Amino acid sequence: MTSALVLLGYLAGSIPFGVLLTRWLRGVDVRTGGSGNIGATNVTRVAGKKLGAVVLLLDAIKGALPVVLAVRLLPDAPTVHVAVGLAAVLGHIYPVWLKLQGGKGVATALGVLLVLVPQAALAAALVYVAVFAVSRVSSLGSLAAGATAVGTSALTARAVEYAGLSALLFALMLWTHRGNILRLARRTERRF
């Protein structure tokens, strides 16, 4: 059952809502505009705030639902919950449907954390909003949110495995944002 849940997590994470919705509703491929990323930030740039918000919500849900299922089926198996959540985020970053060229995993990670460490997800979301409101730089908000999730998870997670997952997700976020980090250091990162 564990393998099936992990596979389900990966396949759910692989659903490229940003690509599908911009193509179906706007007739454009989000990968050819803005940053070329498939996530909510670039969808907002390419197709508008409303569609960006829908993609944000759907990307979070595709992280949350497989984890909810794993928690319901195997309530005393935090390692399985972590594996399923990690698989969902990796599915978003490396989707089988897009030749492993996906997004940065921020919204999907938020969905995973909403289930496993809701306090960390809430704190991260609040920090993102605050940092973005001041800086108008989405990547800076995402990185600050990821760091906040790690700290909050260390203090509030019900299982040490969940705190470890938060740290691992932040490490993945650093990897997927490596170009953004360089641009932040050079002060050339895009603002909204």
Curated annotation (Swiss-Prot):
EC class of the enzyme, as a word: transferase
Spans through the membrane: 1-21, 51-71, 78-98, 112-132, 155-175
Gene Ontology molecular-function annotations: acyl-phosphate glycerol-3-phosphate acyltransferase activity
GO biological process: phospholipid biosynthetic process
InterPro entries listed in its UniProt record: G3P_acylTferase_PlsY (IPR003811)
Enzyme Commission number(s): 2.3.1.275
Catalysis performed (reactions): an acyl phosphate + sn-glycerol 3-phosphate = a 1-acyl-sn-glycero-3-phosphate + phosphate
First-listed, main subcellular location of the protein, grouped into a coarse class: membrane
Position of the signal peptide: none
Membrane-protein topology: Multi-pass membrane protein
Pathway the protein acts in: Lipid metabolism; phospholipid metabolism
NCBIfam families named among the record's database cross-references: glycerol-3-phosphate 1-O-acyltransferase PlsY
Protein family per UniProt: Belongs to the PlsY family.
Protein function: Catalyzes the transfer of an acyl group from acyl-phosphate (acyl-PO(4)) to glycerol-3-phosphate (G3P) to form lysophosphatidic acid (LPA). This enzyme utilizes acyl-phosphate as fatty acyl donor, but not acyl-CoA or acyl-ACP.
Protein name: Glycerol-3-phosphate acyltransferase
Species of origin: Myxococcus xanthus (strain DK1622)
